[in-house]
Amino acid sequence: MGVISPTETLFLKSQHRLLQPRNYSYALAFHSTRRVANFPRNSFSSLGSCSVDFPLRSNPISQNSKSIHPWRRYVSESDSNELYHKKVSSIMETLKQAYSFIPHGILLSTILALVYPPSFTWFKPRYFVPGLGFMMFAVGINSNERDFLEALKRPDAIFAGYIGQYLIKPLLGYIFGVIAVSLFNLPTSIGAGIMLVSCVSGAQLSNYTTFLTDPSLAALSIVMTSISTATAVLVTPMLSLLLIGKKLPVDVFGMISSILQVVITPIAAGLLLNRLFPRLSNAIKPFLPALTVIDMSCCIGAPLALNIDSILSPFGATILFLVITFHLLAFVAGYFFTGFFFSKAPDVKALQRTISYETGMQSSLLALALATKFFQDPLVGVPPAISTVVMSLMGVSLVTIWKNRKE
């Protein structure tokens, strides 16, 4: 019988304890499967050291965990939190980029209104004011008081916008009204309707299109439209008398109420929210683009659906052609008129786009209301009804074109 070495003696004395070793508090990794490993029986060498036949890796664990595999909860919570934040960031970024879907929304609403008018007939004219007001709120919440103070320091640009709205556009309206009657043999009431569109104030939608293209000039656009709307109580009746031969009284209190509801109140609300509750304002901003796309789609699809009979009338195609050409030339005239007189301005391109919107987009809804109230012939209201849709689609299309060129 050989002599037992000290190491073997230690092993024999300790064998009853080594058969069932205790679990260690750190985790061991076996390939891709993570587990807390017990040491096997024959895991000791002749030197008494611990050895295993697979790679070991320690992982951080939760100290207060009651689970036999606490690292599992740690890893799953960490991964799930990271995944959650990534999803939230992705959703927020998509919402912020919703403005890029405006052309798709407009096209979809136009097709729906033509194919199935009841899809938009629920959006009655009484909803137009709050609908436009919501767009102005989106402009206000993304602006500040300094923008409007800077806009008031540019009286020459404001005057140029006024000339575009009440000189260039009425001149084009008169020309196209005469062309409609003399060259296309359309009824006189159709020509009067085209002229009526050119006599009204600028459209509030022009403020929003300017905001999408050149946010720094949105306040200037708002000032231009507000001044043209405020003075429409005097200018529109005079222009209608000069061009159509009929003086149309405009409701002064109605115009003031319209400015307050559509422009001043929502913009002031947005500015105040920015100033007094910045955290709430920042929480709301990511959702506004998507909501505005839906709002704008309704404001454009509804007039088309509500006036579908006029648009599909025997004169509809000819009137559509005339109205498209009329607005197109107005956009072009406003653009080059501004470029000629403000060629040395540092922001001449942005200013050209802004005044182009102001010249090309008139308040066709106001023209439609005047035609319905003061003219017995319903055909007078056909050009304003078509103009509402055409003007909006052309303005939004220009937003897409100009934004892509800027980028």
Swiss-Prot record:
Tagged with keyword GTP-binding: no
Disulfide bridge positions per record: none
Keywords from the UniProt entry: Chloroplast, Membrane, Plastid, Transit peptide, Transmembrane, Transmembrane helix, Transport
Phenotypic consequence of gene deletion: No visible phenotype under normal growth conditions, but plants contain reduced levels of aliphatic glucosinolates.
Transit peptide, start-end: 1-57
Keyword Transmembrane helix: yes
Transmembrane segments: 101-121, 122-142, 162-184, 191-213, 222-242, 252-272, 286-306, 317-337, 379-399
Induction of expression: By wounding and methyl jasmonate (MeJa). Down-regulated by salicylic acid (SA).
Annotated InterPro entries: BilAc:Na_symport/Acr3 (IPR002657), Bilac:Na_transpt (IPR004710), Na+/solute_symporter_sf (IPR038770)
Superkingdom as given in the UniProt entry: Eukaryota
Gene Ontology cellular component terms for the protein in this record: chloroplast envelope; membrane; plastid
Tissue distribution: Widely expressed.
Biological-process GO terms, alphabetical: glucosinolate biosynthetic process; glucosinolate biosynthetic process from homomethionine; response to jasmonic acid; response to wounding
Membrane topology field: Multi-pass membrane protein
GO molecular function: monocarboxylic acid transmembrane transporter activity
Subcellular location field: Membrane; Plastid, Chloroplast envelope
Family named by the database record: Belongs to the bile acid:sodium symporter (BASS) (TC 2.A.28) family.
Function, as annotated: Plastidic transporter involved in the biosynthesis of aliphatic glucosinolates by translocating the biosynthetic intermediates of Met-derived glucosinolates across chloroplast membranes. Transports short chain (C2) alpha-keto acids, such as 4-methylsulfanyl-2-oxobutanoic acid, from the cytosol to the chloroplast where they are subjected to chain elongation cycles. Also functions in the transport of chain-elongated (C3 to C8) Met derivatives from the chloroplast to the cytosol. Does not seem to be involved in the transport of indole-derived glucosinolates.
Protein name per the record: Probable sodium/metabolite cotransporter BASS5, chloroplastic
Organism ancestry: Eukaryota, Viridiplantae, Streptophyta, Embryophyta, Tracheophyta
Gene: BASS5
